[in-house]
């Protein structure tokens, strides 16, 4: 079991960090009293692998409970769990500006001075900062850049595998799926609907797929579609996107769109991407899924 203790200056980006860590598959808890860390670790252990990575935000909002942190970390280590400390920092001027923009008061703002609150907080957190495994300065980082910094630290292996690609076929006469990121119209391809022996089948049947893909236009389009999607994927990942919904439509959503969606699904699956396939309007309930 791996724990990441997220801490740092108020206004330095801890809330944004939690959102990113959740996207990376961490179970996140904000403002957990430090004394409860060992108990939380025990609960995670009882989950039998359901929770394998957790990120806990611990900061001076805990007040008097914050003093229990180092003792709790020592106990966590004694229980055989790994942990590391992620410390978020930023220039005082930037922190003050962020507080003013959000119109929030500093947690240690007892005399009306944000600056004094930041100074006091730095003093209280110095030992924790000295023990940090990673320190990220967010002064010049926008949220997407912060997420990329976190990705470089906490995401192992092929970053493309963090993007879930959902491919869905549909029929335009039933409406475009509202959650689509990319929509492709394949109504220009040969239509099996007008072939008597094929009209009652769908693109999930080999003979329908063979009919559609027997056209050079279909082959060329499917290859170009794969090329454009392959080009876009790393750029979406770089922007921090975690899910990509590709909708492919024909008139009724039973033949051409199902066929092209099927082809694209297998092209991306063979490249090792996490991809799911569904057919909204095919009249069938089957759905193929693959995560790798």
UniProtKB/Swiss-Prot annotation:
Record-listed ATP binding positions: 8-15
Example GO molecular function: GTP binding
Gene3D superfamilies: P-loop containing nucleotide triphosphate hydrolases
Alphabetical list of InterPro entries matching this protein: P-loop_NTPase, RapZ-like, RapZ-like_N, RapZ_C
Keywords in alphabetical order: ATP-binding, GTP-binding, Nucleotide-binding
ATP-binding is among the record's keywords: yes
Residues annotated to bind GTP: 59-62
Highest rank taxon of the organism: Bacteria
PANTHER family: RNASE ADAPTER PROTEIN RAPZ (PTHR30448:SF0)
Function: Displays ATPase and GTPase activities.
Family: Belongs to the RapZ-like family.
Name of the protein in question: Nucleotide-binding protein Amet_4092
Organism: Alkaliphilus metalliredigens (strain QYMF)
